[in-house]
Amino acid sequence: MNTFGREFRITTFGESHGKAVGVVIDGVPAGLPLSEEDIKRELERRMFCHIHWLNPRCEPEEFEILSGVKNGHTQGTPIAIVIWNKRAISSYYDELWMKPRPGHADLAYYLKYGKFYDHRGGGRASGRTTAAIVAAGAVAKKLLSQLGVDVCGHIIELGGIEVRRSYTFEEVKSSWAKPLPVVDDEALAAMLETLRKNAAEGDSVGGGVEIWAVGVPPGLGEPHFGKIKAELAMAAFSIPAVVALDWGAGRALAKMRGSEANDPIIIKSGRPALESNKIGGVLGGITVGEPIYFRVWFKPTPSVRKPQRTVDLAKMEPAVLEFKGRYDVSVVPKALVALEAMTAITLADHALRAGLVRRDRPLRDPVV
C-alpha cells in the first residue's frame, strides 16, 4: 500500500529517478493556515547539503502545491504536493541492472515485481521518496500546532558515537541550529569525524534518533487494535532502513522489578500525571497527556564503494558489485526528519479520530 492513515490520510507516489515524488493528503479541515514556506521549511531541514557526505545529490526541493490550498488556507479538499527530481544521474545504475545490491530492496522488488521494477537510485524504495512524507508532515505539524502539540527529534547515536548526557526538550529543539541536531557538542564533533572517515573509505554508518512529542492530549489511541504505540511503530517502520524501535525507558524497563518500573501517579496542575514518565506517555495503548518519546535505529546505507558479492539474475551466476555512484554516508539525519513527519501524521490522524479536530467544519469554528 502507498496510503497511510484513516482520517488524516496520505498517499505518496514517485521513484528516486522519476520526474517527481509527491503526496496527496486527505482529511485536512478547511481554514488551516498553510503556506509554501511551511512546506519549504520542513524540506530544507531534510537536506543537510552543508555536509556533502550526507547528501551529495542535494536536490533543490523545488515543489508545487497543486490543490487544496487557496489564499494561504486549506480548503478542506485533497492537498496535492509534487516535488521535482532535478539531479538524478541514472547512468550510474546501468551496470547494476539485474544485479541486486546487497542490503537494498533490489532483490525483494525483483522477486515481487519481476523485471518491471525501477532499480535506479533504489526506485520506489529510495530514501528520496521520504521527501513526500516530509511535505505531508509539514501539514500535519501545522494541524497539531492548533492543539499545542510540538514534535521534534534529534540524533542520539551515529557510527557508534553516542550521546550520553541528559537533556531537555528545549535543548533538543535548539540542537537544530548545529551542523547536525545533536545536543552534546563533544559527541557531535566525533560524529562529524566518523562521517568524514567513512566517506573517505567509501563506507557508511548507521545510528539512532529520538523523537519527542510534547503537548499530546490524553485519550489518543485505542485499547487493543489501533494502540497509539503500535501505529507509531508501524509509521516508523514505513521509513527505509529502520531496524529497531525502543519506547520510553525501553529495554531498561525489562531489567527492573515492577516496583521500580511502575510510575507513581501524582497531581500536577490540577490533573493526574506521572512522576517520571518512564513509559513514554502511553498506558494501555492510549496517551495520558505526558510527553511521548521513543528511539528508532537505522542500518548503514547499503550502497558503499567496496566490492560486494551478489548474483547476476539474467545469467543466474555469482557476480561482484562495486558501486561508483553517489550515496549518503548515513541515512540517519534525513531519516530523522521523515520520522518526525510520520509521527506528526499519526498523531494528526488520531486527533481527527478522537474528534479533537473536526473535518466537517472550518477550524475557525472551534470544537475544543
From Swiss-Prot:
Superkingdom of the source species: Archaea
Single biological process term from Gene Ontology: amino acid biosynthetic process
Reaction(s) catalysed (UniProt annotation): 5-O-(1-carboxyvinyl)-3-phosphoshikimate = chorismate + phosphate
Keywords recorded for this protein, A-Z: Amino-acid biosynthesis, Aromatic amino acid biosynthesis, FAD, Flavoprotein, FMN, Lyase, NADP
EC numbers on record: 4.2.3.5
GO molecular-function terms, A-Z: chorismate synthase activity; FMN binding
GO cellular component term, pick one: cytosol
Binding site for FMN: R124, A125, S126, G284, K299, P300, T301, P302, S303, R326
CDD domains (UniProt xref): Chorismate_synthase
Enzyme class label: lyase
A Pfam family per the record: Chorismate_synt
S-S bridge residues: none
Cofactor note: Reduced FMN (FMNH(2)).
Cofactors required: FMNH2
Residues reported in the UniProt entry to bind NADP(+): R46
Keyword NADP: yes
Family recorded in the similarity comment: Belongs to the chorismate synthase family.
Job of this protein: This reaction introduces a second double bond into the aromatic ring system.
Name the UniProt record assigns to this protein: Chorismate synthase
